[in-house]
Amino acid sequence: MFAEYKTLEEVKKQIVFKKIVSWDKDKLILDDGTVITIEFSEQDCCAWAGGTFKDVKLDAVITDVQIQDKGQCIYNGDGHDSYADVVIYHNQNEIAKAECEANDGNGGYYYSVCALRVKDIQCVITEA
């Protein structure tokens, strides 16, 4: 993995106290124009990673962001999958979720990284 990844705390500094004003399954757009995406940031050979946003509520102020681990390196019969959700909150209420997954490719010999991207900052969500 490359050293360019930042912590979730650094991502929060870019988005907390802003509002989600538009969204689709691939991105959230905040009131200041900031775009939040889920990126397939690294991989080798046939490994892959990704995620999509769902259940987004507009115009609520972001007060927190959490990454919830849903299982790491779970054997799938040919390699391993890792799962995590990115959950965005207004107070204690969920206002957006991205379900994310990473796969380590054919036979588990490779790797992939799924990252949350805000501006030029990337934060690892999950990896396999």
PLM feature segments, named:
Residues 1-128:
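Surface-exposed, interaction-prone regions used to assemble/regulate multi-protein complexes
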